[in-house]
């Protein structure tokens, strides 16, 4: 089976209010980048709202959309891993469901990958709109501490928003770790990895899925 040029993988937890606009914007960005040769993979991570019902409705009207329903809430990193394991694209864009990371940057990220002959283009947050000073300070401190205690340097001010080649994704998927820290694991696999600066938008709807207590638990794992 021929692979699509692009997969867009999006883990979702209680994001029903974002999904229709997310689907429309991601679909438009994908078509602008690769025409009709793409897939969108939504992973419902045990949501308690109407996320799964919305996904099913959207998938019924869009052959490009694959909707995966996990049996319970497994957490963002495992949900994302499930989507990465099932996606088929030659390039894979990872993006969150809250629309803080603009899918419209896809074309420029692909151009960066091509021009710099990179296997990973990771998005670096230049500005973070709509976040409290406390959130910005705790996030900055958390990732700087995490960077100091890990063996592999992890780019600062990044999330999981990134574009990966198929060979980089296959290398990531070969790693056996059960406790998944995806941005750290991607940094570890090697290949040429380059930054892409962007301004992070406000969340479209809902609340953050990474409050301080979850960040602490994440670090302890």
Predicted ranges, named:
Residues 197:
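Conserved S-adenosyl-L-methionine
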Residues 191-193:
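Histidine/lysine/aspartate-rich catalytic loop segments that bind and position anionic ligands
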Residues 1-132:
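Structured catalytic core of nucleotide-sugar glycosyltransferases
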Residues 66-86, 103-185, 201-220:
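Acceptor/aglycone-binding surface of glycosyltransferases and processive sugar-polymer synthases
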